């Protein structure tokens, strides 16, 4: 029979405090079964502030990423287990492995068809002692928060310091860090692959029937993955139709394997009939068919 695949997704969080309050709030979540924190709200406030300061200092374009979030879908059998225990186990597994702070919540969607964990984690760790930088001479910052070399660069024609610019006098603190820099491993594809393996294994630990075990989806396999339909997705009908076509292909691939057709042959058909045709169609119509 066709393997069931685990679903684990990662998101970037530009507003970690807002996201924490959203996933952990009974008022905003219809089916919230448990929440778990490894650090208090002061930690997250400080993290958000320092991330924004660092981002401003770097002068990088785009959005500041304050933290990241994993979404882990759990098989329906998990609804029979004690929610707080499940959430604690899954969150502590992450903290033990990566040594970072987390906040998590266990939810069901509205129709109670998708039992899942939201796990927010910090990419920075607290320093043993705050790193405080004291100005050995006057330090100047322009309107964007960028450090400049001379007072002249932030002085208007009237001889006054321009609005929004700052001067830190000698002996004053001009920068302080409570956290390390971001751990870059969380950005990479290898991390997502690893965490999918880790959580798929953990999910399977609590499922006694091997037939029900989940597998990490292998994009080089004969099967096509289903697409997830998010809340209030305007393309819901399109995605449902697309998923039905994918299931049809997966059933056909199953039948072909059972009838003795080699995996290599099926992969060849998948490549020519699906991937190549889809990319031609995308080039000509700009549609996402796969």
Residue ranges: model-predicted function:
Residues 1-290:
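N-terminal nicking endonuclease/strand-transfer module with a His-rich metal-binding environment
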């Amino acid at each position: 029979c066709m393997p069931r695949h685990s679903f684990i997704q990662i998101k970037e969080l530009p507003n970690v405090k807002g996201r924490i309050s959203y996933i952990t709030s009974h008022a905003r979540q219809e089916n919230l079964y448990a929440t778990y924190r490894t650090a208090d709200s002061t930690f997250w406030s400080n993290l958000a502030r320092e991330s924004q300061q660092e981002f401003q200092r770097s002068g990088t374009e785009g959005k500041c990423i304050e933290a990241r979030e994993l979404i882990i879908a759990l098989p329906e059998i998990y609804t029979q287990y004690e929610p707080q225990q499940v959430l604690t186990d899954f969150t502590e597994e992450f903290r033990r492995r990566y040594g970072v702070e987390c906040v998590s919540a266990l939810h069901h969607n509205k129709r109670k068809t998708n039992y899942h964990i939201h796990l927010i984690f910090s990419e920075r760790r607290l320093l043993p002692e705050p790193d405080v930088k004291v100005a050995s001479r006057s330090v100047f910052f322009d309107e964007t928060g960028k450090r400049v070399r001379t007072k002249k660069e932030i002085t208007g024609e009237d001889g006054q310091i321009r609005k929004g610019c700052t001067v830190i006098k000698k002996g004053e603190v001009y920068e302080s860090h409570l956290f390390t820099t971001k751990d870059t491993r969380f950005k990479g594809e290898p991390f997502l692959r690893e965490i999918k393996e880790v959580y798929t294994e953990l999910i399977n630990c609590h499922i006694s029937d091997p037939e029900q075990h989940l597998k990490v989806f292998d994009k080089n396999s004969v099967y096509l993955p289903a697409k997830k339909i998010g809340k209030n997705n305007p393309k819901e009908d399109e995605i449902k139709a697309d998923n039905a076509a994918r299931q049809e292909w997966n059933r056909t691939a199953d039948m072909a394997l059972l009838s003795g057709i080699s995996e290599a042959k099926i992969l060849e058909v998948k490549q020519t009939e699906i991937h190549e045709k889809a990319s031609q169609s995308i080039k000509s119509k700009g549609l996402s068919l796969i």
